[in-house]
Design a protein with these regions (language model features):
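Short, flexible segments with low predicted structural confidence
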Residues: 14-15, 22-23, 29-31, 79-80, ...
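Short, contiguous, pocket-lining structural segments
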Residues: 27-31, 50-57, 70, 74-79, ...
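Auxiliary, metal-adjacent structural segments of Zn-dependent hydrolase domains
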Residues: 31-34, 38, 61-66
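Active-site flanking loop/helix segments enriched in acidic
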Residues: 24, 35-54, 88-96
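Divalent metal-dependent phosphate-bond-processing catalytic cores, especially two-metal-ion Mg2+/Mn2+ enzymes
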Residues: 1-23, 48-52, 56, 60-71, ...
Length: 224
């Protein structure tokens, strides 16, 4: 047991001694396939500016962390999942999903799947995106659910509560926020989560809020 403890301690120390990860600023781009453009148009047409920027930053954080972890992933799937992962928080998302879920993440997954079906996306790809969106509120999303789901969760977690914030160089963190400003993200998201908790007391949002999620948002390393 002592050897195992020393091994884990050594891994932590090695991780702490690694320099923060970064990428070239010109690699921070939004993919421009027809499906990505359509997803981006849907996002901007139904979401407030702060939520649009959150979804775009989620994608960029996800791609940066994917490079850090040396992951191979489908860029189009990851972008569409990131762009639409909070669709359940919008009026259009609720209509597309036909109100079938108690949780906004699951409702967003239904809505995204309906949007993808309208654009002729194959069943398997629709299912991968829908599952990634449905799972993004979980505490952890292991790789067994797909690299895209794992990275979407990581990107959203970084943007919302600052998870893995210090793993990235300050320069690249600043560049992402410069490209897509936070626009009072903390205050806006806290208000929205409280609203979700009241409207859907059995949802994951309500569960998370009852277990310190609001405080985690407010005390993340981001300024706003």
């Amino acid at each position: 047991m002592a050897q195992a403890m020393l091994f884990r301690l050594n891994l932590r120390l090695r991780a702490q001694n690694k320099p923060p990860f970064s990428v070239e600023a010109d690699s921070l781009r939004i993919p421009d396939s027809a499906l990505c453009v359509a997803a981006g148009q849907l996002l901007t047409s139904v979401s407030e500016p702060w939520l649009v920027n959150h979804c775009l930053r989620t994608f960029l954080w996800a791609t940066i962390l994917g490079k850090k972890e040396h992951r191979t992933y489908d860029e189009e799937l990851l972008f569409v999942g990131s762009a639409l992962h909070d669709l359940g928080l919008t009026d259009v998302g609720a209509k597309l999903s036909t109100g079938r879920a108690e949780c906004f993440a699951v409702e967003g997954a239904f809505a995204a799947e309906a949007f993808l079906a309208q654009h002729g996306v194959a069943d398997k790809r629709r299912e991968l995106i829908a599952e990634a969106i449905s799972l993004h509120l979980n505490v952890r999303v292991p790789l067994k659910h797909g690299v895209e789901a794992h990275l979407l969760h990581a990107g959203a977690g970084l943007d919302v509560v600052g998870a893995r914030y210090r793993e990235l160089a300050a320069s690249i963190r600043d560049e992402v926020v410069h490209l897509h400003p936070r626009i009072e993200m903390k205050n806006n998201l806290v208000a929205l989560m409280k609203q979700q908790s009241r409207a859907r007391p059995l949802s994951r949002a309500a569960f998370l809020c009852s277990h310190g999620f609001i405080s985690m948002i407010r005390h993340s390393a981001f300024a706003s």
